[in-house]
Amino acid sequence: APPAVPAHPPRRVHCEGRDAPRAGFRLVDTTPYSRCANLSAGGPGAPRCFLSYRRAAERGHDALGVTDICLVMPGKGESTPHTFSRVERSLNSGTWGPALFLCYKLSMAKGNTLVYEAGLLCRYPEEDSASFPLPDSVPVFCLPMGATIESWPSGTKYPLPVFSTFVLTGASGDKVYGAAIQFHEPFPPERLSEKQRLRLGLLSVVDRRPVGGRSVHSRKSICVLSHWPFFDVFRKFLMFIYRYSVSGPHVLPLEAHIAHFMHNVPFPSPQRPRILVQMSPYDSLLLCQPVSSPLPLSGASFVTLLQTVGAEHALTLLLAVLTEQKLLIHSLRPDVLTSVGEALVSMIFPLRWQCPYIPLCPLALCDVLSAPVPFVVGLHSSYFDLHEPPRDVIFVDLDTNSIFQSEERKLLSPRALPRRPCKVLLSSLHSLSQQLHESERGWG
């Protein structure tokens, strides 16, 4: 099995005589057949290079692991494969010979998991309002990877809740914004069938005897739906509800906090543009009136778009949306998909994107990628571990800052845009990107 390695820092290429051994990293200096594992493509006398890696914590859960590696030689026209990252150090440490780079793929290192279609457990209010009926598809958007039952080694630390956002578009074009957090709860093992116990590693395969040292958990989600994209406020509210539910006992029941937030908190207005909501002595929420802007209100984050794809790719994506391409954005971080997707369809204002738009698409609905119409769809990158995507789709990898297009189609180029406006826009994007980089460095 591939080593489970955290996403940061990446694995390294270690050259003898040049690099000092790093604490916590292991050196792969021999093959499984005890031969030298030198990766250097240099000639005689060139320093030997070896792969070094660091394993994740033994009891880590939902960690990213290296599931595939490959070598690319740019001098022969080879490029980094889709969903792969490249170690920016050539394996050819000598003077002669072409550059050779190691590429690796990160995927969720999960095992002993049962996946089911998500369903609704409870809701508030319990009855639909005439103007805002609860969409039936909400559960699968709250858990886009499915509802799971998982078996962990005893003593495993609970992973932190995962925040995500999504957008549901009605037939009239009205948007409903969703904010959700996913978390884990203990699951009673006695509710499992023998077949489920076997698949979760709770029974031995040979004699069906119980396997000790494991615990069972289920993945659940809580969600807020609104016609307003107050994602930051909703994230803080959901995290408060989650922490409140797993701690206690408390004087006020959990339902009292939910009812207060839903019914008693006024919407910001010109007379009261800021509403401070005190959830507890230590938790408060600040709702602000949306800024007046010619742009329609949305959940777009142009900062996130520029940080993840850069100036040149942002311009290419603008062209892709203007020319109504089939566009798939994907990431291992579900919290960035909606903000980037909203930015893509918002930056063509005053034009409107009229084609299918699902910025966070559940894996169960991925058949939309075969639609014969343009679309903007966001997916978790694990989609590529399970499916072969259509060849007429443009893929935008937000984790590796790369765009992949089929070789059978003419590649999109910003040169198709009017020359002078394109030059001005690109210069502005570069300036903004530089400012963001400097501000990040200042905060870091």
Each language-model region and where it sits:
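UDENN/dDENN subdomains and adjacent acidic, S/T/P-rich linkers in DENN-containing trafficking regulators
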Residues: 97-444
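Peripheral, non-catalytic segments of secretory and membrane proteins
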Residues: 1-110
